[in-house]
């Protein structure tokens, strides 16, 4: 997926720490986040689909989806028991999956971490059946903080795209781009932590997240493509 030098951020204790400090939410909020992600992905999927998430992290994106088979690939196997219980199967090596056996590949805020994004997209294309879907999401990084270099920056992003350049990359990797746009995204972890602390429940989590997105909008690039 990435050369050893870049992998160090996501393996072993460093990987556990990265997910704990940058991605983890309180256990009580995992279903809230999982439902939010399912609402985002479900319109593109069918109950009969086999789906693979490439760079699945903690597995929230797949947990609440109604699909026949849910596969999660990442560099390290630390899916929470609750995610495994939701029927998500961890796959330690995506190259071991037979070609043309997946109906949809999800890559949600992972491509920007990968040293060779074109190679990752080509691997996803190999796994997809003809007319299979690629659901790709990356940050739309335009904030002031990105105008300078910070050697201690904690997110480890290696690339940044806009709608045009991401579409160009996906097209060059042999996909047909069906949709490409930006959309609101972010504050899931912050809203989850405070909703649990303040005992606001899932409605409070969603309301707090909407408020934050209104006050300080953050966006992502969203792209849907198919394999010819």
Q: For the regions a protein language model found, what residue spans apply to each?
A:
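Non-catalytic N-terminal targeting/anchoring module and adjacent flexible stem/linker
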Residues: 1, 227-228
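Conserved N-terminal segment of class I S-adenosyl-L-methionine
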Residues: 1-98, 104-108, 121, 181-183, ...
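S-adenosyl-L-methionine-dependent methyltransferase catalytic module, highlighting the catalytic core
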Residues: 5, 18, 24-28, 115-123, ...
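Short glycine-centered segments of the SAM/dcSAM-binding site in methyltransferase folds
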Residues: 50, 131-133
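Short catalytic micro-motifs in class I SAM-dependent methyltransferases
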Residues: 109-113
């Amino acid at each position: 997926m990435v050369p050893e030098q870049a992998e160090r951020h996501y393996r072993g204790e460093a990987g556990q720490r990265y997910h704990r400090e940058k991605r983890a939410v309180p256990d009580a909020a995992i279903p809230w986040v999982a439902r939010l992600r399912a609402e985002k992905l479900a319109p593109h999927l069918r109950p009969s689909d086999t789906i693979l998430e490439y760079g699945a992290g903690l597995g929230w994106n797949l947990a609440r989806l109604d699909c026949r088979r849910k596969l999660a690939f990442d560099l390290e196997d630390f899916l929470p028991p609750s995610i495994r219980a939701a029927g998500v199967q961890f796959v330690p090596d995506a190259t071991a999956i037979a070609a043309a056996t997946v109906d949809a590949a999800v890559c949600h805020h992972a491509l920007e971490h990968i040293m060779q994004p074109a190679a990752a997209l080509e691997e996803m294309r190999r796994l997809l059946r003809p007319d299979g879907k690629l659901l790709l999401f990356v940050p739309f990084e335009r904030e002031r903080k990105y105008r300078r270099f910070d050697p201690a920056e904690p997110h480890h992003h290696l690339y940044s795209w806009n709608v045009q350049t991401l579409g160009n990359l996906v097209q060059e990797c042999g996909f047909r781009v069906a949709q490409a746009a930006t959309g609101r995204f972010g504050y899931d972890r912050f809203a989850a932590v405070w909703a649990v602390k303040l005992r606001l429940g899932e409605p409070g989590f969603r309301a707090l997240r909407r408020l934050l997105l209104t006050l300080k909008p953050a966006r992502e690039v969203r792209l849907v493509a198919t394999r010819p």
